[in-house]
Amino acid sequence: MYKMQLLCCIALTLALMANGAPTSSSTKNTKKQLEPLLLDLQLLLKEVKNYENADLSRMLTFKFYMPKQATELKHLQCLVEELKALEGVLNLGQSKNSDSANIKESMNNINVTVLELKGSETSFKCEYDDETVTAVEFLNKWITFCQSIYSTLT
């Protein structure tokens, strides 16, 4: 009696695992897409750190939201939702060392890459943490997120 239920449960588990498990080619593609995303985030962090002290301290007064638990590619939607605000802050703090064309290009690259990574799924709703973070913390956390996802794909 229980044998049949156990076999059904095992079959269902195997079916779910097979459908949810990424293939090696999709893992390879995901890794390839994560690399430029990581580089663009690092470039933006470098831009933020390039600002003169007065600009940087003013920029750090702006706060950004992070998702409560970012563990999957779908959480990149939360990055996209805060990206426009980040671009505004970076453009406010323009200095001689910074190039707005590079910032805009990085923002566009991030948007395109995130769309490719998360797919066209738009129904995901971000649950944000109550605490806000600075631009530097925001970028560092997303860099760490990408590195974490990348390391799980290896």
Curated annotation (Swiss-Prot):
Source taxon at top rank: Eukaryota
Annotated GO MF terms: cytokine activity; growth factor activity; interleukin-2 receptor binding
Endpoints of the signal sequence: 1-20
Glycosylation sites: T23
Keywords from the UniProt entry: Adaptive immunity, Cytokine, Disulfide bond, Glycoprotein, Growth factor, Immunity, Secreted, Signal
Principal subcellular localisation of the protein: secreted
This protein's record includes keyword Lyase: no
GO cellular component: extracellular space
GO BP terms, alphabetized: activated T cell proliferation; adaptive immune response; cell surface receptor signaling pathway via STAT; extrinsic apoptotic signaling pathway in absence of ligand; interleukin-2-mediated signaling pathway; leukocyte activation involved in immune response; negative regulation of B cell apoptotic process; negative regulation of inflammatory response
Xref: InterPro entries: 4_helix_cytokine-like_core (IPR009079), IL-2 (IPR000779), IL-2_CS (IPR030477)
Disulfide bonds, paired cysteine numbers: C78-C126
UniProt subcellular location: Secreted
Function per UniProt: Cytokine produced by activated CD4-positive helper T-cells and to a lesser extend activated CD8-positive T-cells and natural killer (NK) cells that plays pivotal roles in the immune response and tolerance. Binds to a receptor complex composed of either the high-affinity trimeric IL-2R (IL2RA/CD25, IL2RB/CD122 and IL2RG/CD132) or the low-affinity dimeric IL-2R (IL2RB and IL2RG). Interaction with the receptor leads to oligomerization and conformation changes in the IL-2R subunits resulting in downstream signaling starting with phosphorylation of JAK1 and JAK3.
Similarity comment: family membership: Belongs to the IL-2 family.
Protein name per the record: Interleukin-2
Species annotation: Sus scrofa
Lineage of the species this protein comes from: Eukaryota, Metazoa, Chordata, Craniata, Vertebrata
Protein encoded by which gene: IL2
